[in-house]
C-alpha cells in the first residue's frame, strides 16, 4: 500500500461515540443478578419479574401503593427522637439520628397513615428499614400506640408492615419498654374486637418479632422473608450445629404453623381487602352482597299441607 492510499484509508475511518444512558434507568436484582429496567421494576412494586425476589421498599412507597389514592393523613409525624442517655458507641447517637434522617428524609423508623383500603377505613403503619435498620425506639413505640388509638377512635382495623432488626440499643431499656407498650396497646384492639393484621417483610427480627409483629389476628409474610429473634448465624455459633435449609424463612415458618399466610407483594392489597371485608362484615365497593334465596318445590309444599292436615285430624 502506497503512502497516498494510507492517507485515504485513514480519512474514511468514522468516529464512534458512546451512547449517553442516564443513570438509574437499569438496575440489578439482588438475588438472580439479572439486569432489570427500573421503570418495569417499580411497576411490579420492587419484585423481580425474573425470579420473584422481593426487594426492600421504603415505608412511604409501601403505604402509597397499598392505600387508596386520595385522602391519607399521617399520624405522629411531629414526634422526633431524642438522645436522652447521651449514648455513644463508635459514634454519637445524635449523629446517627441526623445521618439516618438525612438519608431517608424520615424523622424515625415508623410511618403511620390513616386512609382507606378499597373504600374501607383503615390505619396502616410501615417500618422504614433504611432508618437505623428499622430499629424500634421510643418514637416508634409512640407512633404505633398513636395508630392503635386512632383505630380505636375510628372503630376500624389496624395493619402493620414490619421490617426491623429489633430494639434500638442506643436507647437501652427505653427501647425494650416499647415491646410491652405496643403489646398492651394491641390488647385494647382485641378487647374491642377490631382486627389487627401483621405483615412481616424481610427482615423482621429481634424485639419487633417478639412483640407487635407476631400479635396479629392474622400473621402474613412476604415470600422468603427472614423472620425470627436471633439471626441464623448467631444461632449456629451458639448451638454449634448446621441449621436446616430455609431456616427462619417465611416458607419454613408457614410449614411449622408460626404464620398464617404467605402473600406476594403485588397481591397484598387485594388479599387484605378481601380479608378485612370478611372480618368487618363489609362488602367491598364494586361487589354485590350475596343474597340467599330459597324456593320451595311443589312437592315440598304439598308435603307441608299434608302434615298440617294430619295434625288437625288428630
From Swiss-Prot:
It is an enzyme of class 2 (transferase). Belongs to the AccD/PCCB family. GO terms for biological process: fatty acid biosynthetic process; malonyl-CoA biosynthetic process. It catalyses: N(6)-carboxybiotinyl-L-lysyl-[protein] + acetyl-CoA = N(6)-biotinyl-L-lysyl-[protein] + malonyl-CoA. Pathway: Lipid metabolism; malonyl-CoA biosynthesis; malonyl-CoA from acetyl-CoA: step 1/1. This is Acetyl-coenzyme A carboxylase carboxyl transferase subunit beta. Component of the acetyl coenzyme A carboxylase (ACC) complex. Biotin carboxylase (BC) catalyzes the carboxylation of biotin on its carrier protein (BCCP) and then the CO(2) group is transferred by the transcarboxylase to acetyl-CoA to form malonyl-CoA. It comes from Photorhabdus laumondii subsp. laumondii (strain DSM 15139 / CIP 105565 / TT01) (Photorhabdus luminescens subsp. laumondii). Its EC number is 2.1.3.15. The keyword Transmembrane helix does not apply. Residues 25-294 form the CoA carboxyltransferase N-terminal domain. Zn(2+) binds at residues 29, 32, 48, 51. Binds 1 zinc ion per subunit. Acetyl-CoA carboxylase is a heterohexamer composed of biotin carboxyl carrier protein (AccB), biotin carboxylase (AccC) and two subunits each of ACCase subunit alpha (AccA) and ACCase subunit beta (AccD). GO terms for molecular function: acetyl-CoA carboxylase activity; ATP binding; carboxyl- or carbamoyltransferase activity; zinc ion binding. Keywords: ATP-binding, Cytoplasm, Fatty acid biosynthesis, Fatty acid metabolism, Lipid biosynthesis, Lipid metabolism, Metal-binding, Nucleotide-binding, Transferase, Zinc, Zinc-finger. Coiled coil: none annotated. Signal peptide: none annotated. It comes from the Bacteria. PROSITE patterns: COA_CT_NTER. One of its GO terms (cellular component) is acetate CoA-transferase complex. It is found in: Cytoplasm. A zinc finger (C4-type) spans 29-51. Its cofactor is Zn(2+). InterPro entries: AcCoA_carboxyl_beta, Acetyl_CoA_COase_Trfase_b_su, ClpP/crotonase-like_dom_sf, COA_CT_N, Znf-ACC. SUPFAM superfamilies: ClpP/crotonase.
